[in-house]
Regions:
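Short linear motifs at protein or domain termini
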Residues: 1-104, 111, 230-234, 244-253
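Short helix-capping and inter-helix turn/linker motifs at the boundaries of alpha-helical repeat units
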Residues: 4, 187-188
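Juxtamembrane/interface motifs at transmembrane-helix termini
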Residues: 46, 142-146, 182-187, 228-234
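An N-terminal domain-start capping segment
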Residues: 69-76, 140-145, 205
Length: 253
């Protein structure tokens, strides 16, 4: 119960910061005011503030109170920060930064995966791909399998730092996939592109793997641009992952 109260308070305050209710550079209201507004104790408020400091959203100091830091200092690899931004609305700048990060990290990662992936690594990536295909053919959660696919590639590098990055990138990648696959037939059209990446890794061809992942990322970027061009407001991801409906017999491999 105490943990739920703490997590709920962190969530309310974090989202209030990210949505701009407490703008960058502003000072949070005094503890008594926050206690009254949220219906929690001072101890809960203080612990929540500590959590938000750890996430890079706040700083405290003598005579300045608790102040909201600039967005550049927020921990964008923190799943909570990404979730708050996703609920608030995904700006073009946020999505641009995310796609640029993918283009920097994933091509180099799949080159290493093509050189180092074990039989077990490949089996796990194959299983993720099978989950993607099944969700298209019979309906289901495509995005979770898509995330497993990409995180499997990162783990297959057998680089400890990249493996840690795969955990941190999880929320960011899921955000990208939720937007890019929201177009009609988006998942079905991206499935062969994923297959090309997997085949190149199986064939131990770093160059082909790199080219294939770049095509995949650029295709996702085009899908995101299409989604943004048809939105009257910034897309948000406050709901559970979209479930695909079953389709007619799939032609994708």
């Amino acid at each position: 119960m105490i943990r739920n109260v703490h997590a709920g308070t962190v969530d309310v305050l974090g989202e209030a910061i990210v949505t701009g209710r407490y703008p960058v550079g502003s000072t949070l209201p005094p503890e008594p005011m926050l206690c009254g507004e949220l219906g929690v104790s001072r101890t809960v408020i203080r612990e929540a503030v500590k959590s938000l400091i750890a996430k890079g959203l706040l700083i405290t100091g003598p005579k300045v109170g608790t102040r909201v830091l600039a967005e550049e200092q927020w921990n964008w690899f923190d799943p909570d920060v990404v979730a708050w931004q996703s609920r608030a609305g995904l700006s073009r700048d946020f999505l641009r930064d995310l796609q640029e990060l993918r283009r920097v990290v994933e091509p180099a990662a799949v080159r290493l995966a093509a050189e180092r992936a074990t039989a077990q690594d490949i089996a796990e990536i194959e299983a993720a791909y099978a989950g993607m295909k099944l969700s298209i053919d019979e309906g289901g959660d495509y995005v979770s399998s898509d995330l497993r696919f990409h995180q499997g590639l990162l783990r297959a590098c057998h680089n400890r730092m990249v493996a840690q990055m795969s955990k941190a990138l999880g929320a960011l990648l899921r955000t990208s996939f939720e937007i890019s696959t929201s177009r009609p037939h988006g998942p079905a059209s991206s499935l062969p592109l994923h297959r090309a990446v997997l085949d190149a890794v199986i064939a131990r061809s770093p160059q082909k793997a790199e080219r294939a992942i770049i095509v995949l990322i650029d295709g996702a970027n085009d899908d995101i641009e299409q989604v943004l061009s048809t939105c009257r407001k910034l897309p948000s991801l406050g709901q559970p992952a979209r479930q695909l409906k079953a389709r007619a017999k799939a032609s994708a491999r």
